[in-house]
């Protein structure tokens, strides 16, 4: 009888420890930076709507962050050739966020946006009607040895990311 109780207690202890270990590993899972090859066309569309038109995306120039809770931030360059010069000057990319973000110190609600890096060293974020939501200072990395057209890399602190278009970048993070 004691032997059965001991085995039962040991089994329950093992199951409890295993379930706590699984819960701990779920908590410790990390955000994943996505490159273009990691983003299927079912996640990031081939064409996006902006200012009354649809424009093709450049899938080879997309990137994103897949957060540990399953939510995404995806961004990429677009072909803005059909747009007016004033819009083309600032509409270079498309951002899709499932979570609130902080970009360059500015709060951004979940949604879809146009963005670009413009003269004067600024990053501009626009709503789908091409209205500027804000402009913030961007960083230009003249020392970058081999710039690529578009990428997202880890920022200087945990949970921050740098969105690069060529040598220009802006820092973003998931907002609280």
Predicted features along the sequence, with ranges:
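Bacterial N-terminal signal peptides that target proteins for export
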Residues: 1-11
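Conserved short hydrophobic patches within well-ordered secondary structure
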Residues: 2, 112-115, 162-163
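Bacterial N-terminal signal peptides
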Residues: 9-19
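Exposed boundary/loop context
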Residues: 14-16, 63, 98
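Primarily secretory-pathway and cell-envelope proteins
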Residues: 22-84, 135-176
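Mid-length scaffold segments of soluble, non-membrane domains
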Residues: 79-128
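Acidic, glycine-rich flexible loop segments
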Residues: 115-148
């Amino acid at each position: 009888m004691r032997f059965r109780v001991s085995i039962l207690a040991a089994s329950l202890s093992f199951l409890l420890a295993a379930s706590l270990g699984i819960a701990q590993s779920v908590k410790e899972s990390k955000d994943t930076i996505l490159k273009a090859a990691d983003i299927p066309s079912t996640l990031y569309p081939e064409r996006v709507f902006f200012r009354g038109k649809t424009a093709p995306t450049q899938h080879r120039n997309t990137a994103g962050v897949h957060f540990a809770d399953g939510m995404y931030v995806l961004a990429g360059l677009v072909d803005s050739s059909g747009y007016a010069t004033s819009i083309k000057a600032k509409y270079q990319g498309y951002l899709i966020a499932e979570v609130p973000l902080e970009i360059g110190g500015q709060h951004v609600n979940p949604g879809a946006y146009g963005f670009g890096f413009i003269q004067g060293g600024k990053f501009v974020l626009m709503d789908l009607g091409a209205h500027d939501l804000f402009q913030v200072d961007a960083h230009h990395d003249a020392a970058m040895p081999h710039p690529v057209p578009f990428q997202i890399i880890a920022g200087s602190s945990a949970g921050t990311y740098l969105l690069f278009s060529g040598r220009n970048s802006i820092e973003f993070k998931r907002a609280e």
